[in-house]
Amino acid sequence: MSEFNVLIIGSGPAGLFTAIWLERLGVDKIAIFDRKQYSAGGLLNDGKLNFDYRVGIDLDELQIDKKEAQNLMQEVKQVFIKFPLCQQVTFIENNEKIDAWRKIAGEHNVEFIAPEQWHYGTDNGKKFVDYLRSSLVNTTFFLGTEVISIEKQDERFCFVCRKDQKRKEYFGKTVLASPGRSGAYWFRDISRKIGVNNNFGPIDVGIRVELNRKSYDSITDVVYDPKFIFHTKRHGDRVRTFCTNPGGRVRIENYDSFKLINGDALFDRKTENTNFALINTVSLTQPFSDTTEFGRMIARQFFLLGGGRPIVQRIGDFREGKRSSKSTFNSKTSHFDRCRATYNATPGDITLGLPARIVDNLWESLKTLDKIVPGILHPSTLLYAPEIKFFDTHFSTDRHLETNIDGIFVAGDGTGKSRGIVGAAISGIIAARGIAAKYFK
């Protein structure tokens, strides 16, 4: 069959939740396209869930208020907690320890956010995706299928696709684009060809910090993924911690022409380390405002400097202004053996690839964090680069996430509508309700 009601790009949380809610609203003949052989984007990486309207969504971007956001989060939560392997890891009700950490952070002019959090782990990612897919009865998946172009033909849209070197066309009344972070650059270009308006928003650029788990247990035993938000004194820029993984691993994200650093945690097997991202929000104006290309330039530079791999540097070396090297990387004399790397990155100097302003901001924030949680700056602590979050392409939409082209809706991280699994799922629900109400009453 090549005729559908809704054509969905991307099988991540935004795409899947759009399909689930469309079916609940009585819409059938749904198709999901993904160039990967297995769905489903961010759902396969770690499975960390933050249920707090201050994390993962922008109320103004989604044109909803706090109450609407909380209601949507409850709807998303009900889907996740029915999965048996998804467990709550941060309890916020009447938690005096959270209040104590908030007070300590406040003494250093740092904002501290402790959301209700659940986790199912990378090792359970495919099981969770299968659990979601099992609820879909009127949705067809086209995996390993690349969408080459989108065309408007009369009152319907045409996807020109390629699979196994063969081309085929699929038609639909409406389109939901949720390309994910890895597909953001591609969809930005392909959408412009059919007249969809988009612009550049801020991008997050930084590092992943890995340290001996004991140095961070005091906070992660209370809040699994603590959120610290800094505003630097020197430049007045925003830096935040993100995606903390107690007992986790450092991993990579593969893109077409570079690799980015990331981190995750398994449900059943833990390491002796903890890792978290420390990222600087960057906005650009004239004459160069393309934050996507800015991030890609940094990523490609690290790809060259690291010989095809991300770069890692010990804080002990960083403080002395020298690069890390293989010969001394695990030196007992320098106390580097306290934290063994969980990913084989290239030892080097992260300051060669990051702009000086970003390095200044990250270092200032690390020093402040060490005052809140002493032990962060142990010489053995590892700094991996680059960690870049491509949430930066923004699409102008109405409150149902429909673009300026009738029938084309967007959702998820890759279109600037969310930052993380829960936010992506929420944007998918909003889009599904908009599609059903306008086109399938």
Predicted regions and their residues:
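Residues forming the flavin
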Residues: 2-57, 61, 96-441
